[in-house]
A protein has these predicted regions:
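Conserved catalytic core of the tyrosine transesterase superfamily
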Residues: 1-207
């Protein structure tokens, strides 16, 4: 009997599910974490935190950034671009002056070259920081400023600036492009917009 061994197409793990519902950071929480990292001279983590907030990249893309993805020569560019692992679509991101300063300081301190991973792993078996390592580092940041780690995750980093941009502009298309989503509905679900708006209406209604 002939046996075929054609693998079935994989269904995305998050198909039909609400993902990314870990809370985004509030501006005051971003400032608090940044201040603590600066005070404690944790240059690697400061660069990782600031770039994570600015880039809005998924954890799997953030940890695989190479120096050349954000640097032109010995200077960090004002914009970066990366091919997303999940969608194989390119996405561009801005790099704010404060983040450029933090990343430049980290690159100099670590002696990184253009082809090096921006955040090398301290574990020998991996050339770059892993997503689990990143999640543990983030948990430390959350605890550092007295927040509950259960309420935050790597998607909190990705959602923070995207949520602020939407709240200030209500421009969903812009946020979709910044997050690299193929469909606008994905952005709506990711930000939890319909749920948040419904709750706000409910809170404003007395009976």
């Amino acid at each position: 009997m002939e046996c075929t061994n054609n693998p079935q197409p994989r269904t995305p793990w998050n198909k039909g599910k609400f993902v990314g519902q870990k809370a985004p950071f509030k501006p005051k929480e971003v400032w608090a974490i940044r201040a603590r990292l600066q005070m404690e001279n944790r240059g690697r983590e400061l660069a990782l935190f600031d770039l994570g907030i600015d880039s809005k990249l998924r954890a799997c893309d953030l940890v695989k950034l190479r120096v050349r993805d954000v640097c032109h020569g010995d200077r960090v560019a004002s914009r970066g671009s990366v091919l997303q692992q999940k969608t194989q679509r390119p996405v561009k991101f801005e790099i704010s002056p404060g983040t450029r300063e933090a990343v430049e300081a980290w690159v100099r301190k670590a002696g990184l070259r253009s082809d090096d991973y921006l955040f090398p792993s301290r574990v020998r078996r991996s050339p770059h920081l892993g997503t689990r390592q990143y999640a543990r580092i983030l948990e430390g940041w959350v605890s550092l400023v007295g927040l509950d780690p259960a309420g935050y995750g790597t998607h909190s980093m990705r959602r923070t600036k995207a949520s602020l941009i939407y709240r200030r502009t209500e421009n969903l298309r812009a946020v979709q492009l910044l997050l690299g989503h193929a469909k606008l509905e994905s952005t709506v679900r990711y930000l939890g917009i319909e749920v948040d708006d419904a709750l706000e209406l409910a809170e404003q209604t007395d009976v």
